Amino acid sequence: MPVQGSQRRLLGSLNSTPTAPPHLGLAANQTGTRCLEVSIPDGLFLSLGLVSLVENVLVVTAIAKNRNLHSPMYCFICCLALSDLLVSGSNMLETAVILLLEAGALAARAAVVQQLDNVIDVITCSSMLSSLCFLGAIAVDRYISIFYALRYHSIVTLPRARRAVAAIWVASVLFSMLFIAYYDHAAVLLCLVVFFLAMLVLMAVLYIHMLARACQHAQGIARLHKRQCPAHQGFGLKGAATLTILLGIFFLCWGPFFLHLTLIVLCPQHPTCSCIFKNFNLFLALIICNAIIDPLIYAFRSQELRRTLKEVLLCSW
């Protein structure tokens, strides 16, 4: 699998940043650039992947088992869990293969290893893209349920949700294959960065608008009951805190990875950017952390899903 320095993990094409001239390391030393490289032990990487894998398998199983959860909203949540499951699983697979190759326990020709790496890269990239898409789809679904409540069930139907899911998966696979094939083209990397920023803006605008509507609704209820202003202010602060956490986690977990892509285009050979490239494994670990957090935010808050999950766990014993 393509490697560069300590960057040994998925998306080997991304790890193969533009080759620096021979004097780059010397230049970095001359300028006194000090690199802060956060090493991610293989055990920690595998542990994070395993936790995410178990969490998201439970979410998919619970939604599949309970027919009451076969609605458009849970369809998107289930697909988000499946995407996160693939992100974690593919990372665990490549880490395990690398460890086996390094230990000499697995013997394979270079061509076979390269083909395996390409397959894993496509799975990882497509699952990342689909994960971002389903986060956006969940935001749109919630927005429609609030602002078009009376027409929600006629607008967001299960067949339409299934078509949207199919379109997201197909587009994610196609774009990931395109990305892996043309990873060394700046335009492809910039398209991925623009896509991330578009999802971030979409989610921020929709959730802020939903928060504003919720605050207006709470203010109206307070007026009807002749309550004082502090109650409404407390609700607004709580909603703002929730929104900050939701968007903050999204940005902190995904932002560094797309910053990495941006810097590959802008300054592939600059010493400071080279220092950031050394933390590619950390950026992947943050994405896996997001896959761990997603079920806590979008799935496990549902009482119906928690009840089904409890039944599944009890039946398994």
UniProtKB/Swiss-Prot annotation:
<dbReference type="GO" id="GO:0005886">
    <property type="term" value="C:plasma membrane"/>
</dbReference>
<keyword id="KW-1003">Cell membrane</keyword>
<keyword id="KW-0325">Glycoprotein</keyword>
<feature type="topological domain" description="Extracellular">
    <location>
        <begin position="94"/>
        <end position="118"/>
    </location>
</feature>
<protein>
    <recommendedName>
        <fullName>Melanocyte-stimulating hormone receptor</fullName>
    </recommendedName>
</protein>
<keyword id="KW-0675">Receptor</keyword>
<dbReference type="GO" id="GO:0004980">
    <property type="term" value="F:melanocyte-stimulating hormone receptor activity"/>
</dbReference>
<keyword id="KW-0472">Membrane</keyword>
<dbReference type="InterPro" id="IPR017452">
    <property type="entry name" value="GPCR_Rhodpsn_7TM"/>
</dbReference>
<feature type="topological domain" description="Extracellular">
    <location>
        <begin position="184"/>
        <end position="191"/>
    </location>
</feature>
<dbReference type="GO" id="GO:0007189">
    <property type="term" value="P:adenylate cyclase-activating G protein-coupled receptor signaling pathway"/>
</dbReference>
<feature type="lipid moiety-binding region" description="S-palmitoyl cysteine">
    <location>
        <position position="315"/>
    </location>
</feature>
<comment type="subunit">
    <text>Interacts with MGRN1, but does not undergo MGRN1-mediated ubiquitination; this interaction competes with GNAS-binding and thus inhibits agonist-induced cAMP production. Interacts with OPN3; the interaction results in a decrease in MC1R-mediated cAMP signaling and ultimately a decrease in melanin production in melanocytes.</text>
</comment>
<dbReference type="Pfam" id="PF00001">
    <property type="entry name" value="7tm_1"/>
</dbReference>
<keyword id="KW-0807">Transducer</keyword>
<keyword id="KW-1133">Transmembrane helix</keyword>
<feature type="topological domain" description="Cytoplasmic">
    <location>
        <begin position="212"/>
        <end position="240"/>
    </location>
</feature>
<keyword id="KW-0812">Transmembrane</keyword>
<dbReference type="InterPro" id="IPR000761">
    <property type="entry name" value="MSH_rcpt"/>
</dbReference>
<feature type="transmembrane region" description="Helical; Name=2">
    <location>
        <begin position="73"/>
        <end position="93"/>
    </location>
</feature>
<feature type="transmembrane region" description="Helical; Name=6">
    <location>
        <begin position="241"/>
        <end position="266"/>
    </location>
</feature>
<feature type="transmembrane region" description="Helical; Name=1">
    <location>
        <begin position="38"/>
        <end position="63"/>
    </location>
</feature>
<feature type="topological domain" description="Cytoplasmic">
    <location>
        <begin position="301"/>
        <end position="317"/>
    </location>
</feature>
<comment type="similarity">
    <text>Belongs to the G-protein coupled receptor 1 family.</text>
</comment>
<keyword id="KW-0297">G-protein coupled receptor</keyword>
<feature type="topological domain" description="Extracellular">
    <location>
        <begin position="267"/>
        <end position="279"/>
    </location>
</feature>
<comment type="function">
    <text>Receptor for MSH (alpha, beta and gamma) and ACTH. The activity of this receptor is mediated by G proteins which activate adenylate cyclase. Mediates melanogenesis, the production of eumelanin (black/brown) and phaeomelanin (red/yellow), via regulation of cAMP signaling in melanocytes.</text>
</comment>
<keyword id="KW-0449">Lipoprotein</keyword>
<dbReference type="InterPro" id="IPR000276">
    <property type="entry name" value="GPCR_Rhodpsn"/>
</dbReference>
<keyword id="KW-0564">Palmitate</keyword>
<feature type="topological domain" description="Extracellular">
    <location>
        <begin position="1"/>
        <end position="37"/>
    </location>
</feature>
<feature type="transmembrane region" description="Helical; Name=3">
    <location>
        <begin position="119"/>
        <end position="140"/>
    </location>
</feature>
<dbReference type="InterPro" id="IPR001671">
    <property type="entry name" value="Melcrt_ACTH_rcpt"/>
</dbReference>
<feature type="topological domain" description="Cytoplasmic">
    <location>
        <begin position="64"/>
        <end position="72"/>
    </location>
</feature>
<feature type="transmembrane region" description="Helical; Name=4">
    <location>
        <begin position="164"/>
        <end position="183"/>
    </location>
</feature>
<feature type="topological domain" description="Cytoplasmic">
    <location>
        <begin position="141"/>
        <end position="163"/>
    </location>
</feature>
<feature type="glycosylation site" description="N-linked (GlcNAc...) asparagine">
    <location>
        <position position="29"/>
    </location>
</feature>
<feature type="transmembrane region" description="Helical; Name=5">
    <location>
        <begin position="192"/>
        <end position="211"/>
    </location>
</feature>
<feature type="transmembrane region" description="Helical; Name=7">
    <location>
        <begin position="280"/>
        <end position="300"/>
    </location>
</feature>
